Amino acid sequence: MIVIVGPSGAGKDTLMDYAAAQLSGRPGFHFTRRVITRSCDAGGENHDAVSMHEFNQLEDAGAFAVSWQAHGLKYGIPAAVYRHLEAGDVVIANGSRSALPHFGTAFSRLKVVNIVARPDVLARRLEQRGRESRDDILRRLERSSLAVAGDFDVTTVDNSGAIEDAGKTIMQVLQQSAGSSQP
């Protein structure tokens, strides 16, 4: 199981889309879609949108391998990922640094890819989204850490430059994981 984490604006979705395009048609890799209590037209990643009530029902029914709450939303990784892992596939999921303890409990073999970018790059990308002023963004970035806390197998990828540069590193991690994956 590979979980992709990093701050807003680091380019997690862009890099996951890049890797999915590079691996299109190749067996052994599964990019899972998160279930989120956010509208599909809210922008951002391609996800399965559900209401809070629906999410709670799914969670109570054991439909998630991992679930967590952040920023007023609930997120879930479908339990169907276990079938892919049992088949020997490399499963790639968009996660959260705050949810890594849950991922660690749910998956015995876990690789974390921490996507980071320079603060000025994060600020520019976040500013382009138009949700916060540049000053608010810079203050928030000064207070935040890009590090992953905990005892995890982490590869940090700097996505401050060209997507192809960070994409090459992501592809190496995925290829190495495929080589060591066991059914």
UniProtKB/Swiss-Prot annotation:
Lineage, top ranks: Bacteria, Pseudomonadati, Pseudomonadota, Alphaproteobacteria, Hyphomicrobiales
Function: Catalyzes the phosphorylation of ribose 1,5-bisphosphate to 5-phospho-D-ribosyl alpha-1-diphosphate (PRPP).
NCBIfam families: phosphon_PhnN (TIGR02322)
Pathway: Metabolic intermediate biosynthesis; 5-phospho-alpha-D-ribose 1-diphosphate biosynthesis; 5-phospho-alpha-D-ribose 1-diphosphate from D-ribose 5-phosphate (route II): step 3/3
GO terms under cellular component: cytosol
Classification via Pfam families: AAA_18
GO biological process, one term: 5-phosphoribose 1-diphosphate biosynthetic process
Keywords of this entry: ATP-binding, Nucleotide-binding, Transferase
Binding annotation for ATP: 6-13
HAMAP family: PhnN
Origin species: Agrobacterium fabrum (strain C58 / ATCC 33970)
Catalysis performed (reactions): alpha-D-ribose 1,5-bisphosphate + ATP = 5-phospho-alpha-D-ribose 1-diphosphate + ADP
UniProt name for this protein: Ribose 1,5-bisphosphate phosphokinase PhnN
InterPro entries the record matches: GK/Ca_channel_bsu, Guanylate_kin-like_dom, P-loop_NTPase, PhnN
Family, similarity comment: Belongs to the ribose 1,5-bisphosphokinase family.
